[in-house]
Amino acid sequence: KIYRTLLCGSLLLFSLGFSSCEDYLDKEADSTVSEEEAFKNFRNFQGFIEEIYNCIPDKEKNNYTTSWNWGDDEIFNPEGDSHMTHQVDLGNFRAWSTNNQCWLYRTGSDPTATYHPNSDGNAKFKHSLWPHAWYCIRKANIGIANLERLTEATDEEKKLIAGQLYFFRAWWHFEMMQYFGGLPYIDTVLSATEKMSLPRLSYQECADKAAVDFRMAADLLPINWDNTTVGKQTAGKNDLRINKIMALGYLGKNY
């Protein structure tokens, strides 16, 4: 009788646990956002772009000391032998990919990490150029491919969205070109199953492609977001929004 009771109890607990797990793992229909919904209006589309802004690595705060003067003669920290500034002096140019000491590459990089003093104080260490660049270039290409879905928007709103996307596609390529020279310029949405066989371009070829995107962005973006209908909703807080001056500045710096 005791064994029978234990067996029945075990079966009951097992069935309850199984049904509980099944309910927990079931995906709610409302949790999947369709492309039509994600890109239909300015607010939704801008939310998609915000993550690209968030991914920009802070080169001054990505480590406990700055790391910007690689290959120069200045000594910024006599004890910082593992830092890239010293590693470049030693000729160890590949240390950026292994020592986890700079903004060019960090393991554990997370596009969704946001810094707040009371939450994740290490979020500033979770943004780095190499992994985020490819992630954001893909996001920009997805956005550009879905511009036609932006149907509930004014002409001004459409230009703001498109301008930011073209700028960021060029900017992430430009940032990598400074350190790696020519590389494939990704201007389409690549399939997850597609073989990566794009040719490596020369620096000049990459710069030419980036210039087209920077020029497009400059033509679409305003000088001052505060003077736009959309920008008036966040007046005084638009200083870091990508604008025409930034696009033209990088267009010139690109060469």
Where are these predicted regions, by residue range?
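TPR/Sel1-like alpha-solenoid repeat signature
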Residues: 166, 248-254
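Short, surface-exposed recognition loops and adjoining beta-strand edges that mediate ligand/DNA contacts
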Residues: 36, 59-87, 186-188, 222-247
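Conserved, well-structured interaction surfaces
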Residues: 42, 46, 54-60, 88-180, ...
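Bacterial Sec-dependent N-terminal signal peptides
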Residues: 1-30
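Membrane-proximal, proline-rich intrinsically disordered regions
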Residues: 21-78
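Long, intrinsically disordered, low-complexity segments
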Residues: 24, 53, 79-85, 133-136, ...
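Short, well-structured active-site flanking segments
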Residues: 177-189
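Short clusters of hydrophobic/aromatic residues that line enzyme substrate/ligand-binding pockets
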Residues: 25, 33, 38-39, 115, ...
